[in-house]
Amino acid sequence: MKTKKFYQHLYFQVLTAISIGVAVGYYMPDTGTAMKPLGDGFIKMIKMIITPIIFCTVVTGIAGMDDMKKVGRVGGKALLYFEAVSTLALAIGLMVINVIQPGVGMNADVTKLDTKGLATYTATAAKSHSFADFALGIIPNSVVDAFAKGEILQVLFFAILFGLALSAMGEKGKPVYRMIDDVAHAFFGVVNIIMKFAPIGAFGAMAFTIGKFGLGSLTKLGMLMGSFYLTCLLFIFVVLGTIGKLCGFNIFKFISYIKEELLIVLGTSSSESALPRLMAKLENLGCSKSVVGLVIPTGYSFNLDGTSIYLTMAAVFVAQATNTPLDLTQTLTILGVLMLTSKGAAGVTGSGFVTLAATFAAIPTIPVAGLALILGIDRFMSEARALTNLVGNGVATVVVSRWENELNATRMSQVLNKELDEAAVEADLLMMDPEPEEA
């Protein structure tokens, strides 16, 4: 088998592109800012392919199940895990921010804050309504509309119904099943083509960020940022690490396995940008297609651990900075509201801030104008949010697969311990035959 040289690996190319992007943004800020279309273009290409991949994966996963009760069982276990772990993430964020108290002493006067930049977020947040509205929003007005607008939960809902219907058809549904499975392979082939542009996208996104906000903005409100990054690391390596150990895998080896996806997320600040490739890698790791197809798409709305940590820390920080006292009842109210609002957040850049604005609107105790304090650094915290979200959903898929006895533990051990030939693993991932060894 051929062994790739270090510079041929996607993770090296993306890391190099990010470094160049930082340099361009710092030394040539105007040029860096002009690179924004490169990052936006890459994310748009990824989003273009997400809904058809989810549809095909979920349909083939469900239609391929022998027991239809399994669909409800997998979904139920996934939602139970999501609620438990994301609530734990909210609680950890709440605990750390109250211990470190980075906002104490800022004495910010909300009447003097520049709130012009909040208009877009508060307007979007104002559209958020009750749980009933959220539940009804999962049902698309039309199938075409759901695909056209890239509504993941709506596509997931339709895919589950279609998969159940296809399974009920029995042998008559087999030709359709095989066709959709072939289409899924073709779409993953498109993903492999798009991923070749990942370094360009990461370069453009990072050059724009540094060019527009400057390295100096990385140090603004640094205590909050440091606290947030520390909390995310604690959550990944302690909480998810413990969960991983209980399920038979090492979190460090798991992170090493998905390092390319993590670097793509680091460059684009969107955990959604790595979704298609993450699904393929989890199947390659030994998780069943049916579990991957149900858990990953659902997790991108119900299991955003990084966003959960951010929401509690940001809310309490604003309260501290504006000298808004919070008693135990008010703190628990914030936690309860966030348990609901955090479930509607999507894995795209900026969604966390919109969710935060919606939460503040529901909790009049904390001044909405206080969001202006963190608007400038929100972009620099989005990387940690997205990275934590990605790792959290990856771990969740392995956990649910194990609960369902749908995890090939031997395969997982071989892949994580790098006992398989690297070229063979890459070939499996790309759904291609391994290249022959050169003479």
From Swiss-Prot:
<dbReference type="GO" id="GO:0005886">
    <property type="term" value="C:plasma membrane"/>
</dbReference>
<dbReference type="InterPro" id="IPR036458">
    <property type="entry name" value="Na:dicarbo_symporter_sf"/>
</dbReference>
<feature type="transmembrane region" description="Helical">
    <location>
        <begin position="45"/>
        <end position="65"/>
    </location>
</feature>
<keyword id="KW-1003">Cell membrane</keyword>
<keyword id="KW-0812">Transmembrane</keyword>
<keyword id="KW-1133">Transmembrane helix</keyword>
<feature type="transmembrane region" description="Helical">
    <location>
        <begin position="80"/>
        <end position="100"/>
    </location>
</feature>
<feature type="transmembrane region" description="Helical">
    <location>
        <begin position="291"/>
        <end position="311"/>
    </location>
</feature>
<dbReference type="InterPro" id="IPR023954">
    <property type="entry name" value="C4_dicarb_transport"/>
</dbReference>
<feature type="transmembrane region" description="Helical">
    <location>
        <begin position="186"/>
        <end position="206"/>
    </location>
</feature>
<keyword id="KW-0813">Transport</keyword>
<feature type="transmembrane region" description="Helical">
    <location>
        <begin position="9"/>
        <end position="29"/>
    </location>
</feature>
<dbReference type="InterPro" id="IPR001991">
    <property type="entry name" value="Na-dicarboxylate_symporter"/>
</dbReference>
<dbReference type="GO" id="GO:0015366">
    <property type="term" value="F:malate:proton symporter activity"/>
</dbReference>
<dbReference type="GO" id="GO:0070778">
    <property type="term" value="P:L-aspartate transmembrane transport"/>
</dbReference>
<keyword id="KW-0997">Cell inner membrane</keyword>
<feature type="transmembrane region" description="Helical">
    <location>
        <begin position="221"/>
        <end position="241"/>
    </location>
</feature>
<feature type="transmembrane region" description="Helical">
    <location>
        <begin position="334"/>
        <end position="354"/>
    </location>
</feature>
<feature type="transmembrane region" description="Helical">
    <location>
        <begin position="357"/>
        <end position="377"/>
    </location>
</feature>
<keyword id="KW-0769">Symport</keyword>
<keyword id="KW-0472">Membrane</keyword>
<dbReference type="GO" id="GO:0015141">
    <property type="term" value="F:succinate transmembrane transporter activity"/>
</dbReference>
<comment type="function">
    <text>Responsible for the transport of dicarboxylates such as succinate, fumarate, and malate from the periplasm across the membrane.</text>
</comment>
<comment type="similarity">
    <text>Belongs to the dicarboxylate/amino acid:cation symporter (DAACS) (TC 2.A.23) family.</text>
</comment>
<dbReference type="InterPro" id="IPR018107">
    <property type="entry name" value="Na-dicarboxylate_symporter_CS"/>
</dbReference>
<dbReference type="GO" id="GO:0015138">
    <property type="term" value="F:fumarate transmembrane transporter activity"/>
</dbReference>
<feature type="transmembrane region" description="Helical">
    <location>
        <begin position="150"/>
        <end position="170"/>
    </location>
</feature>
<dbReference type="Pfam" id="PF00375">
    <property type="entry name" value="SDF"/>
</dbReference>
<protein>
    <recommendedName>
        <fullName>C4-dicarboxylate transport protein</fullName>
    </recommendedName>
</protein>
